[in-house]
């Protein structure tokens, strides 16, 4: 593990830090996930975004099943050290497991959440089943 990389990061009590994926060109927020120290190290080593799944209790590389990998162009750490922003190039233009560009596809309008972004590719086409 790279001590210089990790020492400034304030991982929570579960050993995780919030990781935000932002499109390097459009600046749109694509997704928010979690990283442990190993996922952060792997991200730096490979240049591709790796995360830690709280539900599956394991590290994973974005796109390992779908092919929608995230090439990291820049890593940024916030002033408190408890959140990371990755400026990324999104392979295939789809970051969300629902087949949308972004996981942030719902907009609050008139007292309700409305779906604002279209599905670019059906989940079943991406994963072979509903993810």
Curated annotation (Swiss-Prot):
It catalyses: 1-(5-phospho-beta-D-ribosyl)-5'-AMP + H2O = 1-(5-phospho-beta-D-ribosyl)-5-[(5-phospho-beta-D-ribosylamino)methylideneamino]imidazole-4-carboxamide. Signal peptide: none annotated. InterPro entries: PRA-CH, PRib_AMP_CycHydrolase_dom, PRib_AMP_CycHydrolase_sf. GO terms for cellular component: cytoplasm. Pathway: Amino-acid biosynthesis; L-histidine biosynthesis; L-histidine from 5-phospho-alpha-D-ribose 1-diphosphate: step 3/9. One of its GO terms (biological process) is L-histidine biosynthetic process. Binds 1 Mg(2+) ion per subunit. It is found in: Cytoplasm. It comes from the Bacteria. The keyword Metal-binding applies. Keywords: Amino-acid biosynthesis, Cytoplasm, Histidine biosynthesis, Hydrolase, Magnesium, Metal-binding, Zinc. Its EC number is 3.5.4.19. Its main location: cytoplasm. Zn(2+) binds at residues 79, 96, 103. Mg(2+) binds at residues 78, 80, 82. It holds the Pfam family PRA-CH. Its cofactor is Mg(2+); Zn(2+). GO terms for molecular function: magnesium ion binding; phosphoribosyl-AMP cyclohydrolase activity; zinc ion binding. Homodimer. Catalyzes the hydrolysis of the adenine ring of phosphoribosyl-AMP. HAMAP family: HisI. Belongs to the PRA-CH family. This is Phosphoribosyl-AMP cyclohydrolase.
